[in-house]
Amino acid sequence: MIGNMKNLDIFDLRILTTLQRDSSLSQRQVADLVGMSQNACWRRMQALQAAGILVGSQARVDLAALGLELTIFVMIRTRHHARDWVDRFSRHVQNLPEVIDFHRIGGEWDYLLKVVTPGMAGYDRFYQRLIDGFEFDKVTGLFSMERILENRPADLNRLL
């Protein structure tokens, strides 16, 4: 069982895999699918939550169906790396509703944002707000032509 998170057993992995695929399942349904009693499953789910492994529960929304058809991966390079600049930039980006993922990355670029907008005009409005008040060395947008694989559950049995 849990204790040390490196000691996840097959039941813990089954619970996590099941919930990654469908977090709307009832506790009873999860227990049945992983082959445990409801009480034992509940205790393990509580332990996984307490350990910070099992976090939240979200429904996936098809943003394109809502008119947010353009997905852009925005890469940013800057020479500013002082903590106060990074904190200010981070707060700024987190207040831009078009940004659905935000990463500080290693390599040639410093930041990667995943952005959704209703179209090119929406992206231009977003871009103007993004750069307002900040100096960057380079900003580039990579436009997604097709979603081939998105939000795939991690194959925990093969990864751990």
PLM segments and residue spans:
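A compositional/biophysical signature of low hydrophobicity enriched in polar/charged and small residues
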Residues: M1-L160
